[in-house]
Amino acid sequence: MSKNIFITGTGTDVGKTYVTGLILKKFKEQGRKAAYYKAAMSGNERRTDGTLIPGDALHVRNVSGIGQPLEDMCPYIYETAVSPHLAAQMEGNPVDLDCVLEHFDRLCREYEYVTAEGSGGILCPLRFDGQKIQLEDFIQARNLGCLIVADAGLGTINAAVLTAEYMKSRGIQARGIIFNHYEKGNPLHEDNRRMCESMTGLEIVACVREGDTDLDMPFDLLESLYTEGEMK
């Protein structure tokens, strides 16, 4: 059975996909069989044949060098750049939680490590019609631990603490925070690091600078954050 983790963020465009690509690259460099998974992906472009390109999955594969087929990375792909629940209302093909879990479980049987990435922040809805499906439904169904990606700049204390506290209230285990767009020596970024650790009780396990092509984090530490979840 694989070891897994879920990558969430303090909001949209904080760099979850960028950081996830660097994480998968680390596993690839260590010779580990690692997979990427995203339940639902919106804001994708079309190929000349009309099919949708899973943009985040393609980015992760290009950055990391993993050989996982794109079609194995995401079961729900939408064109409109909105939350998956709204994209499905506009385009059809709403998310089915059983399908999401079955796809994830298959990857868990085939790979040593599975890194799942969320859409937007922790409260992003996957479906909101006759059925209501949140990201946390997927996380809780497989008892996944989480890493929080946060921007290192202004406003991150509030965003990181609210995210961590919500996860705690829902029984979701946060294993640490990764700062993105971090500038060493920047007084604001350094203070944000101290304050986020103090106010959330979580460690900033890595800081990613603009343009980094590698994750500055010992592999043993990264690997220790992954745990065996529950698979049906």
Q: Where would I find each of the regions flagged by the language model?
A:
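C-terminal lobe/tail of nucleotide-utilizing enzymes
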Residues: E165-K232
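Switch II (G3) loop of P-loop NTPases
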Residues: V100, F104-Q131
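Inter-motif core of Ras-like GTPase G domains
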Residues: F128-A152
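N-terminal phosphate/diphosphate-binding loop that engages ATP/GTP or pyrophosphate donors
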Residues: N4, Y18-P94, D98, H103-R106
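Conserved glycine(s) of the Walker
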Residues: V14-G15
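Charged helix-capping and loop-helix junction motifs
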Residues: F128-E136, V161-A164, H189-R194
